[in-house]
């Protein structure tokens, strides 16, 4: 017997080996009165193509806001990871040197831009970094201090 015939006999069934038994059952007539009412009620309802489906992104466990006060530039990556994980971050840069704070803001601005989020100044050296799933409304007016000259 060739290999081809072996595969053929393995994958095919011989009809002679199996006899199918057909059982004829007598079925009781179904009461049409109840079924007709249910069908009529079902057909009266207008069929719309739109189902009640909820997007997975709209259902979240809970939103978190992370408060961060970096002391060195190396902590900027940890803040960026929070933003990438779709958490809003408030960054307080009051306890870091100005040049380091500027580098952190530049780094976070790139991160926020890459994910389609937003960065806003909410106070003196305090910034709010938000991903695209967080909407911020309203503004905070700047308070002028005696140290800062007025910019005309």
From Swiss-Prot:
Start-end of Basic and acidic residues biased regions: 28-42
PANTHER family in the cross-refs: CELL DIVISION PROTEIN SEPF
Keywords: Cell cycle, Cell division, Cytoplasm, Septation
Function noted in UniProt: Cell division protein that is part of the divisome complex and is recruited early to the Z-ring. Probably stimulates Z-ring formation, perhaps through the cross-linking of FtsZ protofilaments. Its function overlaps with FtsA.
Pfam families in UniProt: SepF
GO CC, any one term: cytoplasm
Subcellular location: Cytoplasm
Protein name: Cell division protein SepF
Subunit structure and binding partners: Homodimer. Interacts with FtsZ.
Family indicated by similarity: Belongs to the SepF family.
Main location: cytoplasm
BP-aspect Gene Ontology terms: division septum assembly; FtsZ-dependent cytokinesis
InterPro entries: Cell_div_SepF (IPR023052), Cell_div_SepF/SepF-rel (IPR007561), SepF-like_sf (IPR038594)
Region feature Disordered, mapped onto this chain: 25-54
């Amino acid at each position: 017997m060739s290999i081809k015939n072996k595969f053929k006999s393995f994958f095919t069934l011989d009809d002679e080996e199996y006899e199918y038994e057909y059982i004829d059952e007598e079925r009781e007539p179904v009461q049409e009165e109840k079924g007709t009412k249910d069908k009529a009620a079902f057909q009266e309802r207008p069929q719309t193509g739109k189902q009640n489906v909820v997007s997975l992104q709209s259902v979240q466990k809970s939103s978190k806001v992370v408060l961060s006060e970096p002391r060195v530039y190396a902590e900027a990556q940890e803040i960026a990871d929070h933003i990438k994980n779709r958490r809003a971050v408030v960054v307080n840069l009051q306890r870091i040197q100005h040049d380091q704070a500027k580098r952190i803001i530049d780094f976070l601005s790139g991160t926020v831009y890459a994910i389609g989020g937003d960065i806003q100044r909410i106070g003196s050296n305090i910034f709010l970094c938000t991903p695209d799933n967080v909407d911020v409304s309203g503004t905070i007016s700047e308070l002028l201090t005696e140290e800062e000259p007025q910019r005309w």
